[in-house]
């Protein structure tokens, strides 16, 4: 499949400025868990960055909604594979989250077909991860289950996690000292690192 056709099918990829590679994003309003947490003071989703700034532009919202609708297209796996192939690093959902178990299974298939790419996916959707054996996840994908509240410890049901610290907390992500970029850090993609702690955005 040509990349032009793949972009038309999927709505294309995003290019987050801090990341070492492209990403796939969905509207934050469609988050199953995040849409509830955004109303909870002290939660990581309160004041969600994906509901502010450039994400509010009409053209950006239109692109996000196109990507959401594209998840139902039977050609989605093939098209996403065509777009990602050849990339060293990929991030799932710099905005948005897993929509269903079928969506997650389709992501697994894309990862299997792009075995030379390292994939990272943060999520708050415990309901779907609890239906998955971590041992069955493609080895080039790391899914980090994110804790819901600021300064909350990591969850204990999943081997890879992420947490968010208040400004005085024990943040491990170096991006704030690196012009808000990953730089040479690849901790989020590294299965040998059980938890990554971010500062509150």
Question: Which residues are covered by each model-predicted region?
Answer:
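Class I S-adenosyl-L-methionine
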Residues: 1-201
């Amino acid at each position: 499949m040509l990349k032009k056709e793949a972009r038309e099918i999927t709505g294309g990829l995003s290019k987050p400025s801090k990341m070492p590679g492209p990403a796939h994003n969905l509207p934050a309003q469609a988050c199953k868990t995040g849409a509830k947490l955004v109303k909870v003071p002290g939660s990581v989703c309160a004041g969600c960055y994906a509901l502010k700034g450039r994400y509010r532009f009409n053209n950006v919202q239109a692109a996000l909604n196109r990507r959401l609708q594209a998840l139902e297209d039977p050609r989605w796996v093939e098209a996403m594979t065509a777009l990602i192939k050849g990339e060293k690093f990929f991030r799932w959902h710099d905005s948005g989250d897993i929509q269903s178990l079928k969506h997650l299974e389709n992501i697994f298939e894309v990862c299997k077909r792009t075995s030379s790419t390292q994939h990272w996916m943060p999520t708050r959707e415990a309901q779907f991860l609890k239906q998955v054996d971590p041992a069955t996840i493609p080895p080039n994908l790391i899914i980090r289950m994110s804790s819901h509240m600021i300064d909350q410890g990591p969850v204990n049901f999943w081997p890879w996690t992420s947490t968010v610290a208040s400004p005085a907390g024990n943040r491990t992500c170096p991006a704030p000292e690196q012009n808000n970029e990953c730089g040479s850090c690849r901790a989020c993609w590294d299965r040998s690192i059980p938890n990554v702690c971010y500062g509150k955005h």
